[in-house]
Amino acid sequence: MSAELASRGRKVYFVGLNEYPFLPLVAGLLRTYAEQDERIAAAYDFQEPVFLVAPVQEMADGIVEPDVLALSCYVWNFRRQMKVAKLVKERYPNVLVVAGGPHVPDRPGNFFEKHPYVDVLAHGEGEVAFRELLATRLSDHPDYTAVPGVSVRRGTEAVVGPKAKRLPRLIDTPSPYLLGVMDGAVATCRERGLRFYALWETNRGCPYSCSFCDWGSATMSTLRKFEDERLQDEIEWFARHDVEDLFICDANFGIMPRDLEIAHALAEARGELGAPRQVRVNFAKNSNDRVFDISKTWHDADLLMGTTLSMQSTDMDVLEAIDRKNIGLDNYRKLQQRYAAENIHTYTELILGLPMETARSFRDGIGSLLEAGNHEDLRVYELGILPNAPLNTPEKIEQYGLRTVPKRMYVERPGTPDDEAETFEMVMETNAMPRDAWVESFSFIQAVQFLHNGCYTRYLSIFLRQEHGIGYTRFYEGLQDYFTGRPDTVLGALYLRMRSLYHDYIDMPALPLANLVASQPDMAADLAPYGRRRGWTIDNWGWLRIATDFDRFHTELREYLATLGLDPAGDARLEDVLRFQQDVMLRPDYSPELGKSAEYAHDWPGYFAGGLLRPRRVRVAYGDQSFGANGRYRPVPGDLKAFTMAAIGTSYPVSRMGHFCHRFESAEVTSLAEPVVSEQW
């Protein structure tokens, strides 16, 4: 089958928008499955998918004489796509508008009353329903209500069709990659100089039923897999088409025994043909030996962007409320140690605002994860209410006191109408976490991200925990309390600005979810020397603000230690670790050619790698040549933009792997007999 097919009359358009360039896999899957029907292949002319965001009117104008308009709807594209459908329907009233995807409600309710330009909703898996819709449309008097898995508009009411049909346990659908259907999208991205992700499925389904997520309910839980031969051929396609970035869309990669074989095949393609260069994946929720082996395989092949050790919350009452089972903190600690022994980067994702979560349990959870050894990457997201999530019922919302705000997703272009601005219902208050507690909790974790994950206080806090018994929660709560009362300090100004911003964030729905920093002129001005981005995050801003006032920050940090009963002037070890903590940070003047060294009274790299703390005069020499996942970013002395890429990487995809500070594995530690001094090469 060729992607360049002769015109056959009935035009089919797909729209599936994303702020980031993801290849339109859904459109390809729907098309190739439908075209197995010879009648459909003969009657319809499938157009190139609309997947790159443009002004709504421009996208609508590009849809010319459509017979069918298919929309793949997610929370990040729903409003714009509805507006495209409305404009197209006004111009071409006979077009059949079909909306599918996770944002289409399982229970139509008043959907068609709100969106009368949509004709059909496709629920769940779309291939079978879409093919039957196209086949039905070819009849003289099409009756779409007979198609399984759809709801059909009749006036403003919904007529629900028969139960949906699903693909078999061994999915044998044609591959849009192998049939050339994706070639046009790849060419478009490359012509525009866009870094894109190739989306890829190896299996479908999720056996879990977390109440905040719609994945398990949407896929009806049963795991089904694509054919082995097809997957191997697609891996070769990715490699031969020099696809740099691959996103595996499975809900739980590593849950199936063959997933390790797939991982080896990708690593072999990377080694033999040079691509893919980077793999993003949703790892299996309950991490196991297979996930470790996959991570090790990709780490060794320089493919891995990090391994998820899932949590969402550490509180048992919260986990019960969201129907979630975790791996347990003891097992989590063992996994952290296992991955750390192989220098494999891990990260843990938490959700703020879950049912039953209090400010105390949230902060204690952060502390317990740091105690368990996750010092590099804690990620926290606000709880959003998805249309088809089990949590999204009137009973659950009332039970837990979930109060939401319809947040804008992005900083929209000037003049963007409200009906084109994407929104997401975000939980900003619950019975267990009032608004002020939500604000303070979010400020707390953001500071932990740029101070601890970002390395400014990581080694100091580990030292204080191990040698002085000062727990991580106490240390970071103390920081917040002390500096919030001192607005004239670097951290004090950051804490108070975050508090003010998050109160505004709740009160002002137009303040965006994804581009919050870019919406604030003062924050954008702070970051201007480091480059222009729409995707700056709060922890990016905090980290770079400290980089700007680096020496002042360290002076003020010493003042805070006095509140803990600590005096560096009278504690040689504390003074030594403070110097090490300052020296280990990546700075704008660092030269890969010259390197950097300093001398200490203790072997701090050895200590923080798990050794004993003994007096030992050492020289620590760093020779890092590049930073970030896969070593993509090389710093240039005095070049703030190059420094920023090396220090924090890109805003998307997010990865804290190999950023912020010098790495022990690149350091040379030499024993000395001479007096201890510091120097820079």
From Swiss-Prot:
> This chain belongs to which protein, by name?
Cobalamin-dependent radical SAM methyltransferase TokK
Give one GO molecular function term: metal ion binding
Per the UniProt record, the source organism is Streptomyces tokunonensis
Q: What cofactor does this protein call for? A: [4Fe-4S] cluster; cob(II)alamin
Cofactor, how bound (note): Binds 1 [4Fe-4S] cluster. The cluster is coordinated with 3 cysteines and an exchangeable S-adenosyl-L-methionine.
Q: Which GO terms describe its biological process?
A: antibiotic biosynthetic process; methylation
| Highest taxon listed in the record's lineage | Bacteria
Q: Name one GO cellular component term.
A: cytosol
User: What top-level class of enzyme does the UniProt entry assign?
Assistant: transferase
The family assignment reads:
Belongs to the methyltransferase superfamily.
Q: Which residues are 5'-deoxyadenosine-binding?
A: 212, 312, 349, 384
Q: In which pathway does it act?
A: Antibiotic biosynthesis
EC numbers for this chain? 2.1.1.-
InterPro entries according to UniProt: Cobalamin-bd, Cobalamin-bd_sf, Elp3/MiaA/NifB-like_rSAM, rSAM, rSAM_horseshoe, Tetrapyrrole_Bchl_Biosynth_MTs, ThnK-like
Query: Where are the membrane-spanning stretches?
Result: none
Q: Which residues bind cob(II)alamin?
A: 18, 72, 74-75, 103, 126-127, 214, 249
Please state every residue range assigned to the domain named B12-binding: 1-144
